[in-house]
Amino acid sequence: MKIVFVNGSPKGNNCISQKIIDRLIPYCKGHQYGILSVNEDMDRNMALQIMNMADGIVIVSPVYAGGIPSVLLGFLSDLEMHMSEKKARVSAIVHGDLFDSDDCLNALSIVEAWTSHTGLAFCNGLGIGGSDQFMVSDAGFDNRHLKEGMADIMRSIIQGVSLASRCVSPGNRMLYRRNMETLHHAKMEENGVEPDTWNVRIARLFRSSSAVKKDTENENVSESDEQKS
């Protein structure tokens, strides 16, 4: 079986989409596979030939504003018009920074609709929320639900079974929300806006305490230097 992984991220190889593809490759044991990175400079004719040869297509893409990147959308539109072979099975993984799954579900529906219009078979979809953590640490890939979802993506392609799409969020919802609030509220304060919630007050208190501690440490260092001199 020939499997093509489509990296739909405009960021190329140094991105979360590629990290996800790297973890799907071990499932291809005994099968041929290739990776197609979608970008403005790609050879569209060559890409079309590759897609026509595929028995299975796995699209991996970030979610931008509730949809998929324009460069990927344009490429899929070209395939819809010019793809001659209609044999491939298609599955998709979309990932977004937001913890909740609404944007991921919308992006998956775009890929599923394209598959139907092109005359291909859509097998399975997986949405991953809060995926920005993967740029900091790979620990999120150890999440049981994420592992099961990725295994289902490859099983649906290889075995030709249709599975219900799902969305997962590898991190902790409360911790993710708290971190995002702290980050965005700090930026708001830098711009002269003062949000007033209990979380903001607590974060402000911790930042003030840290600043006082740092000033005290600097004063102690200065006094020590003066005594030595």
Identify what each model region corresponds to.
Residues 1-86, 117, 158, 162-229:
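N-terminal beta1-alpha1-beta2 submodule of the flavodoxin-like/Rossmannoid cofactor-binding fold
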Residues 11, 15, 62, 66, ...:
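Charge-dense, low-complexity intrinsically disordered segments
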Residues 21, 72, 76, 108-111, ...:
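Amphipathic alpha-helical segments in well-structured domains
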Residues 87-98, 140-153, 174-193:
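A short, terminal or domain-edge coil/loop segment
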Residues 89-145:
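Short, glycine-/small-residue-rich phosphate/pyrophosphate-handling segment
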Residues 127, 132-175:
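Active-site oxyanion/phosphate-handling segment shared across diverse enzymes
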